[in-house]
Amino acid sequence: MEKTELIQKAKLAEQAERYDDMATCMKAVTEQGAELSNEERNLLSVAYKNVVGGRRSAWRVISSIEQKTDTSDKKLQLIKDYREKVESELRSICTTVLELLDKYLIANATNPESKVFYLKMKGDYFRYLAEVACGDDRKQTIENSQGAYQEAFDISKKEMQPTHPIRLGLALNFSVFYYEILNNPELACTLAKTAFDEAIAELDTLNEDSYKDSTLIMQLLRDNLTLWTSDSAGEECDAAEGAEN
């Protein structure tokens, strides 16, 4: 299928909320090997975010049920098997995205904005893997996620305005990584607060195109800070799942 047709089909699939189809189309576009435009890049990101998002929330629900089920309950094995099925789907999706990033997207990125976008994505998908991993596998996955986020973070600080939505989105997700994966509320709050404060200080640099995106992410940073600081004051831990980009 021609690239233009694949893009049209991906947009149609998005409107129909058939994200698996959308992801298949955008994977095919990526595998043609040319650098993606901003629009194509966003279509790819939205497709896989929705595809993996369904599995992540399903995994959380099933894991929660599993933890609350009595060990003597005959249903426990069935629940465990089902969780592992969802886990396997989640791993497969993440592996596919990480392969696309390493083989095509990061290698072909010619500007800092794209590079940061794809490295953030790499950090995100290793983070999703870390959510379901254990033992040495989890340790390695966490290192991979942190490495990608850190590389993206260093480039974004050097090359982008503090109000840039990609830089803000990266700070948001990197802080969620610190809070949820590394269990380090202090670092998570420092990172989120610094990103928020730096953006506030330069609000006049916001361009009209990205005003809505930037202010939305700033609101999410602030929401997480509120949640995390109240949580560390001794509130219910389970509720403190941070909003992410």
Curated annotation (Swiss-Prot):
Locations listed in the record: Cytoplasm
Crosslink (Glycyl lysine isopeptide (Lys-Gly) (interchain with G-Cter in SUMO2)) position: K49
BP-aspect Gene Ontology terms: negative regulation of DNA-templated transcription; negative regulation of monoatomic ion transmembrane transport; protein localization; protein targeting; signal transduction; small GTPase-mediated signal transduction
Record-level GO cellular component terms: cytoplasm; nucleus; protein-containing complex; synapse
InterPro entries, alphabetized: 14-3-3, 14-3-3_CS, 14-3-3_dom_sf, 14-3-3_domain, 14-3-3_theta
Top-rank taxon, per record: Eukaryota
SMART domains: 14_3_3
3'-nitrotyrosine modification, residue list: Y82, Y104
Site (Interaction with phosphoserine on interacting protein): R56, R127
Residue list for modification N-acetylmethionine: M1
Residues with the N6-acetyllysine modification: K3, K49, K68, K115
Record-linked CDD domains: 14-3-3_theta
Record field: transmembrane: none
Phosphoserine: residues carrying this PTM: S92, S232
Keywords of this entry: Acetylation, Cytoplasm, Isopeptide bond, Nitration, Phosphoprotein, Ubl conjugation
Annotated GO MF terms: 14-3-3 protein binding; identical protein binding; protein domain specific binding; transmembrane transporter binding
Chief place of localization: cytoplasm
Pfam families in UniProt: 14-3-3
Family designation: Belongs to the 14-3-3 family.
Purpose of the protein: Adapter protein implicated in the regulation of a large spectrum of both general and specialized signaling pathways. Binds to a large number of partners, usually by recognition of a phosphoserine or phosphothreonine motif. Binding generally results in the modulation of the activity of the binding partner. Negatively regulates the kinase activity of PDPK1.
Subunit structure: Homodimer. Interacts with CDK16. Interacts with RGS7 (phosphorylated form). Interacts with SSH1. Interacts with CDKN1B ('Thr-198' phosphorylated form); the interaction translocates CDKN1B to the cytoplasm. Interacts with GAB2. Interacts with the 'Ser-241' phosphorylated form of PDPK1. Interacts with the 'Thr-369' phosphorylated form of DAPK2. Interacts with PI4KB, TBC1D22A and TBC1D22B. Interacts with SLITRK1. Interacts with RIPOR2.
Protein name stated in the entry: 14-3-3 protein theta
